[in-house]
């Protein structure tokens, strides 16, 4: 399954939650599920499988991943010493495209991914183009001097979509972000029951 490129607000309405990595829009104005009259303005009670699928989809859509990419991260998370769910969330937050987004360089993770793939992003002073790089403590993230003048960057730095998390320190003068410490599960900027995601993949890997 490839990355989603359809209507983002429709996805968030279906999941019943705002996903800041997917879109700056919110479902506040249209909170009902998509469909004729919002399925009579009600949300049917989901089955256990439906709940697990919904929590998994929150992660996949917010971080802009294909099913294959998310499965691969789950495999890696299982190898860690910490609880699988916590490790999965940390791996997601540590992706370079997410860090570029959380640092305030881009309005969404998709936009941050474009900055990376087009080589606007510098990691420890070197140009990189791989969005899935996992940052480590002490890593420094910045943009090329010419890239800081891009309209999307200027606008987002002036009006960031989210408050920068504590695990990312920020140097205003140099416009450089630094990984102060590794992110924790509570640093994920939307509610998700990650244990449901772990259970979803329990018999699928």
UniProtKB/Swiss-Prot annotation:
It comes from the Bacteria. GO terms for cellular component: small ribosomal subunit. InterPro entries: Ribosomal_uS4 (IPR022801), Ribosomal_uS4_bac-type (IPR005709), Ribosomal_uS4_CS (IPR018079), Ribosomal_uS4_N (IPR001912), S4_RNA-bd (IPR002942), S4_RNA-bd_sf (IPR036986). CDD domains: S4. Residues 94-157 form the S4 RNA-binding domain. Keywords: Ribonucleoprotein, Ribosomal protein, RNA-binding, rRNA-binding. Residues 25-48 are annotated as: Disordered. The keyword Cytoplasm does not apply. One of its GO terms (biological process) is ribosomal small subunit biogenesis. GO terms for molecular function: rRNA binding; structural constituent of ribosome. Gene3D superfamilies: Ribosomal Protein S4 Delta 41, Chain A, domain 1, RNA-binding S4 domain. One of the primary rRNA binding proteins, it binds directly to 16S rRNA where it nucleates assembly of the body of the 30S subunit. Part of the 30S ribosomal subunit. Contacts protein S5. The interaction surface between S4 and S5 is involved in control of translational fidelity. Belongs to the universal ribosomal protein uS4 family. This is Small ribosomal subunit protein uS4. It comes from Methylobacillus flagellatus (strain ATCC 51484 / DSM 6875 / VKM B-1610 / KT). The lineage of its organism: Bacteria, Pseudomonadati, Pseudomonadota, Betaproteobacteria, Nitrosomonadales. The gene is rpsD1.
């Amino acid at each position: 399954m490839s990355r989603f490129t359809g209507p983002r607000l429709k996805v968030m309405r279906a999941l019943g939650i705002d996903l800041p990595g997917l879109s700056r829009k919110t479902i506040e104005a249209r909170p009902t599920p998509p469909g004729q009259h919002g399925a009579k303005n009600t949300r049917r009670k989901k089955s256990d499988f439906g709940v697990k699928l919904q929590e998994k989809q929150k992660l996949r859509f917010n971080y802009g991943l294909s099913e294959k990419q998310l499965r691969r991260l789950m495999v890696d998370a299982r190898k860690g010493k910490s609880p699988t769910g916590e490790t999965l969330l940390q791996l997601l937050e540590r992706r370079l495209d997410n860090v570029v987004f959380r640092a305030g360089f881009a309005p969404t993770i998709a936009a941050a991914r474009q900055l990376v793939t087009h080589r606007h992003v510098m990691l420890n002073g070197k140009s990189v183009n791989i969005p899935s790089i996992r940052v480590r403590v002490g890593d420094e993230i910045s943009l090329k001097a010419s890239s800081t003048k891009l309209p999307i960057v200027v606008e987002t730095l002036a009006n960031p979509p989210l408050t920068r998390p504590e695990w990312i320190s920020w140097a205003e003068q140099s416009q450089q972000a630094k990984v102060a410490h590794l992110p924790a599960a509570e640093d994920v900027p939307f509610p998700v029951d990650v244990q449901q995601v772990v259970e979803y993949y329990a018999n699928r890997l």
